[in-house]
Amino acid sequence: MSSERLPGKVLKEVNEKPLLLHQLERVARSKHVEKIVVATSTNPADDEIEKFAKKGNISLFRGSEGDVLSRFEGAAQESGATTIIRLTADCPLSDPEVIDHVITKYLEQPNACKFATNAIPRSYPAGLEVECFSREALEIASLEAKEDYDREHVTPFFYRNPHRFFPLSVVSTINYSKERWTLDEQSDFYLIKKIMEALSQIKVDFKMVDVLNILDANPDWRKLNSAVQETPRLVKDNIFKGADSG
């Protein structure tokens, strides 16, 4: 809720419903996700998130604002999860089929693989990122990660230590990396609002392909947030043991 660029962004409404609820409903359509936990901070600014969760009977965990890694570990411990899917709340267009695809690829790997992601190298639209990792990997990272960046962003420790976590990159057969469907600034909200309002009239459970189709039918929409600058990535693409197209 304390976002500097767009305060309160996850509770902004489209079709009279908070974006966070839109996302949770979409994630709940995953065939593999068994439990959803909203992991927010103890910052009083996030009290509204707690109210939202209680109203909707949604599982909630509150932890450190800056040490998000410890917050995730606390949420995992409380939920009893052994395999964890990390999604950020600024991605209201999360696609359950993409989530399931990453989970499936992760589960197909040998036990040595403790982390899978479709985020690096970027081939999916920004806003459809999925990270899947073991509880064991999370506990190791929480115990050993010392850099502030690693603790704030949860998974960089995995990227820094590929020889220990054997990260798997799940890559789309078509490169959609120029698509931006994440929520950081007001212009992002304008685009997401247009997409949701248009597609909700056609189908409730719209997928990535539906978003691509409606953007192709309305090419000017992409210009709405084309000026937004993405935060540079710290981790390079060449750390992965391999890429799995799909």
Would you name each region that the model predicts?
Residues 1-40:
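N-terminal glycine-rich phosphate-binding loop and ensuing alpha1 helix
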Residues 41-46:
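A conserved acidic beta->alpha catalytic loop
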Residues 68-73, 89-105:
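Acidic donor-binding/catalytic loop of UDP-sugar-dependent glycosyltransferases
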Residues 79, 95-123:
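Conserved donor-nucleotide/metal-binding helix-loop-beta segment in metal-dependent transferases, i.e.
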Residues 81, 130-142, 186-190:
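Conserved nucleotide-sugar donor-binding
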Residues 84-85:
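Short aromatic/hydrophobic "clamp" motif used to bind/position activated sugar donors
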Residues 133, 154-246:
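Conserved alpha/beta core of the MobA/IspD/sugar-nucleotide pyrophosphorylase nucleotidyltransferase superfamily
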